[in-house]
A protein has these predicted regions:
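Catalytic phosphate/metal-binding cores of nucleic-acid and nucleotide-processing enzymes, i.e., regions
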Residues: 1-112
Length: 112
């Protein structure tokens, strides 16, 4: 990954963080941990999912979901979600979130 790619990723993560903080004020970006990454954001008390953020011109949804799933396992949580850049807008709430249908159902309808 080039420095330019890292800069784009960091910029995207930083742009999305305020939207997350609206709901979870103590959320923060995580430091990179190599193969032991646990998602791109730390959200205190969140034990259901991690978020992997992507800002690429070409989409690789299956690859990104695989990475998010691996990082969820590293964080000992059941689900990985991908936030990815929507071209043509910088509004953090207009970016995309991708997950498996099972993840969506588990998050929307959690077991009691």
């Amino acid at each position: 990954m080039t420095n330019r790619s890292k800069q784009k990723g960091t910029s995207f993560e930083s742009s999305v963080l305020p939207a997350i903080k609206e709901k979870q004020p103590l959320a923060e970006r995580r430091a990179l941990e190599g193969k032991q990454d646990k998602g791109d954001f730390y959200i205190p008390g969140e034990d259901r999912f991690v978020i992997e953020a992507k800002n690429h011109k070409e989409m690789d949804l299956s690859g990104w979901l695989r990475e998010a799933t691996t990082e969820a396992a590293n964080a000992n949580v059941p689900h990985g979600v991908v936030f990815h850049k929507k071209r043509g807008t910088t509004d953090p709430r207009e970016q995309y979130a991708t997950m498996k249908v099972g993840t969506f159902l588990d998050l929307v309808y959690p077991e009691e």
